[in-house]
């Protein structure tokens, strides 16, 4: 029963136990001290919070009082100086409104901070005081409980000490009893071993003696054994008793030890935690409520301040000069309203209150009106340039003053170092070098702006005065139509605005599509390859000026640049062609797999759009579908076109994935291109221009930019429109720029400037327009410039225009019918009217520039039977030149070249050409004005009349050849007269007829009296890509002319453009003065000064 514990003495064990108990007692004392310290820190913290908020309340109150004083100071000043006119709120100017809101915000902040101070003093500070009191009371009670727990723990430790000492005592008694028992057992063993050895030493000699010895020894051994046994039994009983007591003491010690460990664990793990919880009871919750009260107060102050700042922000955003100007003028209406007009004050009974235009002063008024007109043209151009400079300067100033440098967020970045804040502030807007430089630039720009503004206003004042005088004189003279000018402000006249209002297809879109349809369907990579940015900008600027740089058949533009202009137009729209409102509906259509069902759903969505947008979409996608059918050549199938036009026509709204949505957009555009016919309504359902893939030249686009070649009324016997001498003086004579007039030089002339052409006597010149009374715009040997009127004889002029005041003009002017009108552009804009030879020769120039791979055919629609004066039908081969039927009821389009297009390049027509006589195309719609023609010499007239027989012979020969060629032709022609122009070009020569033959052909065409009309521009030279819509397009402004004696040139609308007339000093003699020249003299006249350059940037 040995154990390691027996080797430790009682004193060692008791000393170790006492040391452990001593450490526990010291730890308990430290615990109470720590809790005392925490209580003191808590009380100190609460006291500091009270002092902080007390001081903050004082600061908030002082701040509130200072803000109130600041607001009252300026409010009193505002009330003292307030304008009585602005007492009503609606009359307050926006800057004053900002100032009032700023002062109101200061007063609001003053009240808010006073409320905040009151909350600090009367709400938050008492909360902290109450928390401090509660914490002290709870700590005292918790400390009492802690002391009681420590006393109980020490009692348990003392009980353990007593039980342990009892265990040690009983265990020692047990050990002693055990040692004594072992000693008795050893004695007994010794006794037994001694008896055995004694018996072995004595040998018995006789039985009697042996018996006696045994008895004696037996008696002695028995007495000693009994003693030993008794002693052993006694010690055994003592050992057993002490052993039992030791076991019981050890059990009690183990139980007490376990109980003591449990009490210690419970105290340290649970009791201390509960004790601390008692100390903290309600402390954190109360502190949380106090701080939330503070936060609520601060947040409400911040909310109030933010609301006021939002009000000021809205007022700042509403700072607008125009509204303040309007409000100011309405408030002071009596100051800013225009005064009464100045009325004519008769003097001494003079009751005439209007201009007098009787014969003595009529000439002076006419001359003055022309001078005013010329002066206004110059002033408008100058003032327009000044205005452009002024607007550019104003934009620069606005950029300076609207720079967004008001964000000071960087200055409020919190950092532990103050150096970063200081550096940010030092580099801010108010840095002296940059500020001084900006101020200097701004002042310099402002000075320049005011200089230009003063110049512009002075020029506009002068224009206003001269315009008023001109209008009154023009009204007095009784002219039928007032000449409109482009004012320096860039405003357009009412006629152009009306035309623009009915332009469903924008000019830029219609012209680009027309050009691409004619020349670019086979162009590889169209819309995908970028064009020249310079040329794109030039074409775009020309369109913005109201011109059409793509008019005519000239193919001298880069196709990629024109495609870029078309895409740029749609990309530059403020709102995309497909509105964002239908984006999601259209995207949902893309998910439909069936293309037919998808097209039906797309149609439903697009029908909700305005009709003008639908017309443009229908026009554009019909063109793209047409273009995609040439994908083998141009490599642009519907998908490639969709990739090019998708981002341009439909923008992806913000908040959507641009990449994924763009793929759906492209798929949508591709579907619309393929199924455009089923998606967009037809012309019966939706009126407007319709794109056509091609066809006969009489098919056209019903567009505001191109007048359809319709015969509105029956044409007279001769298509040339004759004016009497008075009409020639006043009515404008225009020429289609694609069909110039030919003239013959009467004298040698050497140009004095680069603008004037030089030529020899007898040279042939092409005339495009009348620049003034004394000058023409023309072309000679490939050079364009000015041609003096006195040096030439106009060959293409009809007899009615042979001279002003000629008897022949008067006679024929009175002879023609006054009830017939011609609506085509050619008849209204060309001085030769329906001269077929002129049409033929002009178109040869155009066709020479065409690619020979294009097969172009022309047909004439069959004339309806039953029309009055019409033949039953048109015969293909033997139709006489003057035998065309006139359809007055159906107003069908007529091909201007239906007869003479069959004339081949005969050897009699092959003559030398002086130079290329095709002028570079200029914008359509810019017709030229001709007026005040100089009279031709009667000798020249006689020479022209003398050659009429030759003209008739030549014309008959040409028509005979036409019939012979038609009989020999193996090609099956249409019911109308058809000519393959390309085959003629391949088989014929490349030269064009000289001027004498040209003149004879024109005279013969007049005698044949054809009612033929020329189509607009070059629409008759190739298959048109446009077809008529159900709606009636706007008529040409030059659609009707009357030939009655004394009739005037009547226009429903003024010409699209008209060159600004130039007035020169009046010559000394009205007749054939040397300065003006005479047709019969052999001495060349002195040419007048050339006119200034015509302003082609301002549409009239």
Swiss-Prot record:
<dbReference type="GO" id="GO:0044327">
    <property type="term" value="C:dendritic spine head"/>
</dbReference>
<dbReference type="GO" id="GO:0046847">
    <property type="term" value="P:filopodium assembly"/>
</dbReference>
<dbReference type="InterPro" id="IPR027267">
    <property type="entry name" value="AH/BAR_dom_sf"/>
</dbReference>
<dbReference type="InterPro" id="IPR031160">
    <property type="entry name" value="F_BAR"/>
</dbReference>
<feature type="compositionally biased region" description="Low complexity">
    <location>
        <begin position="1067"/>
        <end position="1081"/>
    </location>
</feature>
<feature type="coiled-coil region">
    <location>
        <begin position="170"/>
        <end position="201"/>
    </location>
</feature>
<keyword id="KW-0963">Cytoplasm</keyword>
<dbReference type="InterPro" id="IPR000198">
    <property type="entry name" value="RhoGAP_dom"/>
</dbReference>
<feature type="domain" description="F-BAR">
    <location>
        <begin position="19"/>
        <end position="324"/>
    </location>
</feature>
<feature type="compositionally biased region" description="Pro residues">
    <location>
        <begin position="1082"/>
        <end position="1094"/>
    </location>
</feature>
<feature type="coiled-coil region">
    <location>
        <begin position="363"/>
        <end position="400"/>
    </location>
</feature>
<dbReference type="GO" id="GO:0048812">
    <property type="term" value="P:neuron projection morphogenesis"/>
</dbReference>
<dbReference type="GO" id="GO:0045211">
    <property type="term" value="C:postsynaptic membrane"/>
</dbReference>
<dbReference type="InterPro" id="IPR051627">
    <property type="entry name" value="SLIT-ROBO_RhoGAP"/>
</dbReference>
<feature type="region of interest" description="Disordered">
    <location>
        <begin position="800"/>
        <end position="835"/>
    </location>
</feature>
<keyword id="KW-0524">Neurogenesis</keyword>
<dbReference type="GO" id="GO:0045335">
    <property type="term" value="C:phagocytic vesicle"/>
</dbReference>
<keyword id="KW-0628">Postsynaptic cell membrane</keyword>
<feature type="region of interest" description="Disordered">
    <location>
        <begin position="181"/>
        <end position="210"/>
    </location>
</feature>
<keyword id="KW-0472">Membrane</keyword>
<feature type="compositionally biased region" description="Basic and acidic residues">
    <location>
        <begin position="807"/>
        <end position="823"/>
    </location>
</feature>
<dbReference type="Pfam" id="PF00611">
    <property type="entry name" value="FCH"/>
</dbReference>
<keyword id="KW-0968">Cytoplasmic vesicle</keyword>
<feature type="compositionally biased region" description="Polar residues">
    <location>
        <begin position="987"/>
        <end position="997"/>
    </location>
</feature>
<dbReference type="GO" id="GO:0030027">
    <property type="term" value="C:lamellipodium"/>
</dbReference>
<dbReference type="InterPro" id="IPR008936">
    <property type="entry name" value="Rho_GTPase_activation_prot"/>
</dbReference>
<dbReference type="InterPro" id="IPR001452">
    <property type="entry name" value="SH3_domain"/>
</dbReference>
<keyword id="KW-0539">Nucleus</keyword>
<dbReference type="GO" id="GO:0031267">
    <property type="term" value="F:small GTPase binding"/>
</dbReference>
<feature type="compositionally biased region" description="Polar residues">
    <location>
        <begin position="1008"/>
        <end position="1049"/>
    </location>
</feature>
<keyword id="KW-1003">Cell membrane</keyword>
<keyword id="KW-0770">Synapse</keyword>
<dbReference type="GO" id="GO:0005886">
    <property type="term" value="C:plasma membrane"/>
</dbReference>
<feature type="compositionally biased region" description="Polar residues">
    <location>
        <begin position="919"/>
        <end position="932"/>
    </location>
</feature>
<feature type="domain" description="Rho-GAP">
    <location>
        <begin position="496"/>
        <end position="680"/>
    </location>
</feature>
<feature type="region of interest" description="Disordered">
    <location>
        <begin position="852"/>
        <end position="938"/>
    </location>
</feature>
<keyword id="KW-0728">SH3 domain</keyword>
<dbReference type="Pfam" id="PF00620">
    <property type="entry name" value="RhoGAP"/>
</dbReference>
<keyword id="KW-0175">Coiled coil</keyword>
<feature type="compositionally biased region" description="Basic and acidic residues">
    <location>
        <begin position="181"/>
        <end position="203"/>
    </location>
</feature>
<dbReference type="GO" id="GO:0005737">
    <property type="term" value="C:cytoplasm"/>
</dbReference>
<dbReference type="GO" id="GO:0005634">
    <property type="term" value="C:nucleus"/>
</dbReference>
């Amino acid at each position: 029963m040995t154990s390691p514990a027996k080797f430790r003495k009682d004193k060692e064990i008791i000393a170790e136990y006492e040391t452990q108990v001593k450490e526990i007692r010291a730890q308990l004392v430290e615990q109470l001290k720590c809790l005392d310290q925490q209580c003191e820190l808590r009380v100190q913290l609460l006291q500091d919070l009270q002092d902080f908020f007390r001081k903050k309340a004082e600061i908030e109150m002082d701040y509130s009082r200072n803000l109130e004083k600041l607001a009252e100071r300026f409010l009193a000043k505002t009330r003292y100086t307030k304008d009585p006119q602005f007492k009503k709120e609606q009359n307050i100017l926006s800057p004053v409104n900002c100032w009032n809101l700023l002062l109101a915000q200061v007063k609001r902040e003053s009240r808010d901070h006073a409320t905040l101070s009151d909350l600090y003093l009367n709400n938050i500070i008492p909360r902290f005081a109450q928390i401090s009191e509660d914490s002290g009371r709870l700590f005292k009670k918790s400390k009492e409980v802690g002391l009681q727990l420590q006393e109980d723990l020490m009692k348990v430790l003392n009980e353990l000490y007593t039980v342990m000492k009892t265990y040690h005592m009983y265990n020692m008694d047990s050990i002693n009893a055990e040692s004594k028992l072992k000693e008795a057992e050893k004695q007994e063993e010794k006794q037994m071993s001694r008896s055995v050895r004694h018996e072995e030493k004595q040998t018995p000699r006789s039985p009697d003696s042996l018996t006696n010895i045994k008895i004696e020894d037996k008696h002695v051994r028995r007495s000693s054994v009994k003693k030993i046994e008794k002693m052993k039994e006694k010690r055994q009983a003592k050992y057993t008793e002490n052993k039992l007591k030791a076991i019981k003491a050890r059990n009690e010690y183990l139980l007490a030890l376990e109980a003591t460990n449990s009490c210690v664990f419970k105290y340290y793990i649970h009791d201390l935690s509960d004790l601390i919880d008692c100390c903290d009871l309600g402390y954190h919750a109360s502190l949380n409520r106090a701080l939330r009260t503070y936060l609520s107060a601060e947040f409400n102050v911040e909310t109030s301040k933010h609301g006021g700042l939002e009000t000021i922000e809205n007022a700042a955003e509403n700072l607008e000069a125009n509204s303040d100007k309007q409000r100011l003028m309405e408030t002071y209406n009596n100051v800013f309203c225009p005064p009464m007009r100045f009325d004519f004050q008769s003097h001494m009974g003079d009751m005439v209150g209007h201009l007098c235009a009787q014969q003595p002063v009529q000439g002076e008024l006419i001359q003055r009106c022309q001078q005013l007109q010329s002066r206004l043209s110059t002033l408008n151009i100058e003032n327009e340039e000044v205005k452009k400079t002024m607007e550019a300067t104003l934009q620069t100033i606005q950029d300076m003053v609207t720079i967004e440098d008001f964000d000071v967020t960087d200055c409020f970045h919190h950092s532990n170092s103050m150096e970063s804040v200081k550096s940010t502030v030092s580099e801010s807007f108010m840095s002296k070098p940059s500020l001084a430089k900006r101020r200097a630039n701004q002042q310099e720009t402002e000075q320049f702006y005011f200089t230009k503004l003063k110049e512009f206003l002075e020029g506009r004042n002068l224009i206003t005065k001269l315009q008023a005088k001109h209008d009154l004189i023009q009204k007095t003279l009784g002219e039928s139509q007032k000449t409109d000018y482009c004012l320096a402000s860039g405003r357009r006249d009412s006629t152009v605005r009306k035309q623009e209002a009915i332009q469903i297809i924008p000019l830029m879109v219609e012209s680009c599509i027309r050009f691409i349809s004619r020349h670019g369907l086979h162009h590889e990579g169209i819309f995908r390859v970028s064009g020249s940015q310079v040329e794109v900008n030039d074409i775009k600027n020309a369109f913005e000026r109201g011109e059409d740089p793509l008019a005519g058949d000239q193919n001298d533009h880069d196709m990629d640049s024109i495609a870029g202009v078309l895409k740029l137009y749609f990309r530059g729209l403020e709102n995309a062609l497909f509105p964002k409102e239908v984006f999601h509906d259209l995207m949902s259509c893309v998910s439909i797999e069936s293309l037919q069902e998808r097209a039906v759903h797309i149609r439903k969505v697009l029908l909700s759009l305005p009709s003008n947008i639908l017309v443009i979409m229908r026009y554009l996608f019909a063109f793209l579908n047409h273009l995609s059918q040439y994908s083998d050549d141009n490599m642009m199938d519907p998908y490639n076109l969709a990739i090019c036009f998708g981002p341009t026509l439909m923008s992806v709204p913000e908040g959507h994935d641009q990449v994924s949505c763009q793929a759906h957009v492209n798929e949508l555009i591709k579907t619309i291109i393929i199924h455009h016919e089923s998606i967009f309504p037809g012309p019966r359902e939706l009126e407007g221009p319709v794109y056509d893939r091609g066809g006969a030249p009489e098919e056209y686009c019903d567009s505001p930019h191109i007048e359809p070649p319709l015969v509105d009324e029956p044409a007279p016997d001769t298509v040339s429109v004759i004016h009497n001498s008075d009409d020639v003086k006043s009515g404008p004579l225009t020429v289609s720029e694609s069909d110039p007039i030919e003239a013959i030089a009467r004298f040698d002339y050497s140009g004095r400037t680069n603008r004037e052409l030089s030529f020899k006597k007898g040279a042939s010149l092409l005339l495009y327009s009348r620049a003034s009374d004394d000058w023409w715009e023309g072309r000679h040997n490939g050079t364009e410039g000015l041609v003096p009127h006195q040096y030439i004889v106009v060959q293409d002029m009809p007899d009615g225009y042979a001279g002003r005041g000629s008897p022949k003009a008067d006679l024929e002017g009175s002879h023609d019918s006054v009830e017939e009108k011609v609506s085509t552009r050619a008849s209204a804009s060309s001085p030769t009217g329906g001269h077929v030879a002129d049409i033929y020769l002009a178109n040869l120039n155009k066709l020479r520039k065409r690619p020979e791979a294009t097969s172009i055919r022309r047909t004439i629609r069959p004339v309806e039977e039953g029309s009055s004066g019409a033949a039953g039908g048109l015969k293909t081969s033997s139709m006489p030149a003057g035998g065309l039927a006139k359809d007055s009821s159906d107003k069908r389009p007529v091909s201007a070249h239906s007869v003479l297009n069959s004339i081949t390049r005969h050897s009699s027509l092959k003559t030398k050409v002086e130079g290329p006589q095709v002028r570079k195309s200029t914008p359509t719609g810019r017709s030229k004005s001709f007026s005040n023609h100089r009279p031709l010499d009667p000798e020249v007239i006689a020479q022209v009349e003398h050659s009429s027989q030759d003209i008739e012979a030549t014309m008959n020969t040409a028509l005979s050849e036409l019939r012979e060629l038609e009989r020999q032709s193996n090609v099956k022609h249409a019911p109308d007269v058809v000519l393959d122009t390309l085959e003629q070009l391949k088989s014929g020569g490349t030269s064009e007829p000289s001027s004498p033959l040209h003149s004879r052909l024109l005279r013969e065409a007049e005698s044949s009296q054809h009612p033929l009309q020329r189509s607009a521009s070059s629409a008759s030279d190739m298959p048109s890509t446009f077809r008529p819509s159900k709606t009636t397009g706007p008529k040409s402004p030059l659609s009707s002319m009357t030939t009655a004696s004394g009739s005037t040139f009547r226009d429903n609308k003024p010409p699209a453009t008209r060159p600004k007339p130039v007035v020169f000093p009046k010559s000394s003699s009205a007749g054939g003065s040397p300065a003006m020249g005479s047709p019969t003299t052999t001495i060349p006249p002195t040419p007048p000064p050339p006119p200034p350059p015509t302003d082609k940037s301002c549409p009239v």
